């Protein structure tokens, strides 16, 4: 929305960036219908209540053999209650009611997208695209009936209307090759749309370390771009893995929310420390095979990662 120059069609067509990649805007209307704590579908009284779990509801005697040996309570996944409303007195979960709500919400979501796209077409001379990305954990984890909602929404959209069809960003670009060129404005889908979730007093300490590691990754990639040595190649690949894992936005997010502060801080430190040790070894061209193998055993994400991208 705030790119330079401003996008002609707002968030409803992609734009190309000077570096080449296309950017798509996240649709706010469809996002609000699923994510909003006040008006989103997942808060319907008929749906299963995520927080009411027998691990906290039942007596320790009833939970013998289910909880840890020390008796500490935890989520078990067995939840007998529905959301009901803003009350501690929760009604029992009724699967039929929940499926009825999912069906109604799927129909409403379908008709909302149909009307939205019809309205957009009346103001645009190109095909609009509505991009609706969501965290996968919303469907089934936080919103137990979420997978059924998706199933019903897709079926209704295919069989009950013809105003829109499903596509992917890649397919849309293949069908529509010409787009506006702009420089995107920094933004996120976090609180207020910018960076305050990932950069404040709770997590700001990580960024000097991440920036140093990023510079060092580029330094070593350029210094050894032509290497044929297997050990150096493996070490540089593992450095790239450790850097990517340290840069995961989950760690800063968890530090901000406080839900797993110590774990998130430890993960960040561990990846940075392993990266730094590998950096020192690569710089000296003296890689410790045992240490490298241990790092690869711990984290082997992206087995074919090309560290030369950092050149």
What are these regions (language model features)?
Residues 3-311:
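Active-site and substrate-binding clefts of carbohydrate-active enzymes
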């Amino acid at each position: 929305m705030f790119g330079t120059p401003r996008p002609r069609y707002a968030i409803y067509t992609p734009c190309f960036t000077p570096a080449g990649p296309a950017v798509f805007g996240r649709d706010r209307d469809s996002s609000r219908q699923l994510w909003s704590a006040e008006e989103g579908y997942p808060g319907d009284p008929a749906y299963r209540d995520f927080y009411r779990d027998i691990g906290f509801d039942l007596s320790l005697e009833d939970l013998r053999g289910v909880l840890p040996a020390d008796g500490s309570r935890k989520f078990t996944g067995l939840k007998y209650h529905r959301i009901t409303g803003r009350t501690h007195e929760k009604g029992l979960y009724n699967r039929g009611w929940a499926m009825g709500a999912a069906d109604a919400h799927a129909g409403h979501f379908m008709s909302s997208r149909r009307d939205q796209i019809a309205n957009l077409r009346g103001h645009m001379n190109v095909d609009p695209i509505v991009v609706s990305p969501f965290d996968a954990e919303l469907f089934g984890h936080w919103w137990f009936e979420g997978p059924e909602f998706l199933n019903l929404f897709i079926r209704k959209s295919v069989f009950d209307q013809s105003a829109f069809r499903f596509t992917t960003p890649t397919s849309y670009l293949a069908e529509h090759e010409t787009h506006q060129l702009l420089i995107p404005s920094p933004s996120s889908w976090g609180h207020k749309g910018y960076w305050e979730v990932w950069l404040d007093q709770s997590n700001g300490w990580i960024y000097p370390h991440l920036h140093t590691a990023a510079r060092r990754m580029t330094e070593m990639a350029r210094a050894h771009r032509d290497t044929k040595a297997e050990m150096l190649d493996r070490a540089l690949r593992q450095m790239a893995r450790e850097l990517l894992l340290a840069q995961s936005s989950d760690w800063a997010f968890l530090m901000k929310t406080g839900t797993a502060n110590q774990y998130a801080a430890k993960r960040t430190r561990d990846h940075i420390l392993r990266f730094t040790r590998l950096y020192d070894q690569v710089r000296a061209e003296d890689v410790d095979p045992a240490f490298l193998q241990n790092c690869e055993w711990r984290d082997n994400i992206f087995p074919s990662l090309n560290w030369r991208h950092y050149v």
